[in-house]
Amino acid sequence: MLRPSILGAFLALVLSLCVVTPAQAVPDGPIEIYLEHIEPLSLAWPADGTLTSGYGPRWGRMHLGLDVGILRSLDVRAATSGTVTAAGWLTGYEGYGNVVTIDVGGGWSLLYAHLSESHVVPGQWVDAGQSVGLAGCTGSCTGTHLHFELREHGTPVDPAPFFG
């Protein structure tokens, strides 16, 4: 155990090494600051169809994505590039039917639901515009359509402002 006098001397020494004088605090030349460049998220429309239902309250509950009216078996495309994280029927998402999810970086992910089939597998890189599956009506749906979600750190957000 350290005696109080030794501990006090040690603390005084440490504190004396941490003192910054005004002359040391002001640089004598230009300061270089490096900032990471982060591209804003921009999405392409994921299917050849029209918006049939938007994000927000619907039928007394929250609709967490966009519904796109599309003919059965037409291609559903990646709205931007990323890595497939899931494809198929997912536990906890039974109402969504056949699903594809894509991690697009920066905490953002995409979810495509009600597909009749998927064309991708987990771990696969997809380019923007590449087919991820075919439109269908799997899970809980009343007709063929694509349900499309944008998620930020797992939380659904309105994708509409991100379409370029």
What label would you give each PLM region?
Residues 2-55, 83, 121, 127-130, ...:
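Intrinsically disordered, low-complexity
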Residues 48-78:
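Short glycine/threonine/proline-enriched tight-turn/helix- or strand-capping micro-motif at secondary-structure
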Residues 74-76, 84-85, 126, 132:
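Generic structural signal for buried aliphatic residues
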